[in-house]
Amino acid sequence: MTEAAAQALKTSTHDPAMPARHIRALRLWLGVIAFLIVAMILVGGATRLTDSGLSITEWQPIMGAIPPLTDAHWQAAFEAYQKIPEYTEINRGMSLEAFKTLYWWEWAHRFLGRFIGMVFLLPFLAFWIAGYIPRKLMPKLLGLFVLGGLQGALGWYMVKSGLVDRTDVSQYRLAAHFGVAILIFGTTLWLLFGLGTETREETRASCADSSATRTESRATRWAASAILLLVFLQLLAGALVAGIDGGLGFNTWPLIAGAFIPSGLDAASPWYLNLFENPLTVQFDHRMLGYTVVIATIAQALSLIHI
């Protein structure tokens, strides 16, 4: 058996003794969660694009699920928003109706997070009581739930950065919030696809035991992992671009600021701040990472089909 196959068997969440109907139920459940996470990310993106993220100035994990229901409640929420820099420096004079539009975007984003938590927790308890969850899968699911809870707290930590001295949120916290969302999504898919229907014996039978196969498999695994890491870094770089509105000032392609490698990439001091706070450098890095991902993916595909 190849090393790759042995590793796959070691890390798989599949238990060959699990009935097929248990596997199907767990896969459906995790698939629904993955779909909702994508919806959550899309709504979060819309919340960012509409500058709605600071419209709710407090974090109430339980009672916050209920939106303002009366005129007095709406007025109280609006008055709280009027105290933060985004209103006093950018949106002064905004009407209550315009504020409601911002509020609903942010409320929908937070509500989706709560809803995903319930979609995870309630079926999880039902599956656990019914004996559907294999022993090796249990700590992974619990870890995923904890990560989701931490993501909610991180979201508030991000929003909090824009309530006192800034008119927007910290790009560092925005990138961290988005990065954790991607980790949760990726972990959910990993658990879902780990619940395969083949047995260990079938997997062993399909694996060729040769030195050449082991070497090729190891190289393929490392290359795929490197590409996955590059994609993750590219997503984080995109979040940094969004966090400092870097796309607005440099919106031409393939040139940026009139050149493929523009001047001004080292304008900030100390030098490392350019990677995170210089809009030109942040967008340049984002583009270069994109090119790198494309080239690496094509090279990997060609190597797999032996061209």
Language model features with spans:
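Hydrophobic cores of alpha-helical transmembrane segments in multi-pass inner/ER membrane proteins
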Residues: 116-121, 179-196, 292-299
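Interfacial helix-loop-helix junctions of multi-pass membrane proteins
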Residues: 47-56, 153-174, 241-250
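Interfacial segments of alpha-helical transmembrane regions
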Residues: 25-36, 136-145, 213-236
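Conserved small/polar residues in nucleotide/adenosyl-binding loops
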Residues: 305-307
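N-terminal signal-anchor transmembrane alpha helix
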Residues: 28-63, 230-241
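Individual transmembrane alpha-helix segments
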Residues: 80-118, 273-293
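Membrane-interfacial, low-structure loops and terminal tails that flank and connect transmembrane helices
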Residues: 2-21, 197-220
